Amino acid sequence: DKLSTPEENTEFSGDILPSDGAEVYLRTDLALAPVKAYVWKNVEGAKENEFGKVIIAREFASGTEMTVSPGETLVVDFGQNCASVPSFVFKAAEGTVLTCLPAELLNDGNGAKIRGMDGPEGSCHRENLRIPHTGIRLDYTFASGDNYVAYYPHCTFFGYRYVSITSTGN
């Protein structure tokens, strides 16, 4: 009977704001830096039921500028799985599309299909995601200009440790 009649709460003096679920805070002070990054282009050791292993064309030291050309894949390792917002500063020709595919793990075991791998060893594994092929991805198309562009989609976040980046142009 007591709970059937609403009463005004006079003890709380703050603002009540609408929310659907838990609050999420953007903590730039906890940003992760890459611990390893490499570009791969070709694959070796592929067999009927194995994708093979990536051939690393070049590696990047921490803090150095990274480049990726058409036909190459840049893999960036942040050292631990996290819920995070990717942030990029890059430059490319007008019309170039940069595709970023976050992943929680790399393919291993020579990309053995029997182990559930979806690509060559050393590439980003995405088959474990709810929408592996079209979901959890960023596509950025460059406009005209010769300046670097900063891209920081702060209204969303992803769970990942690795990021696979490809480009349609230089």
Where are these regions (language model features)?
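Extracellular/oxidizing-compartment recognition motifs
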Residues: D1-N170
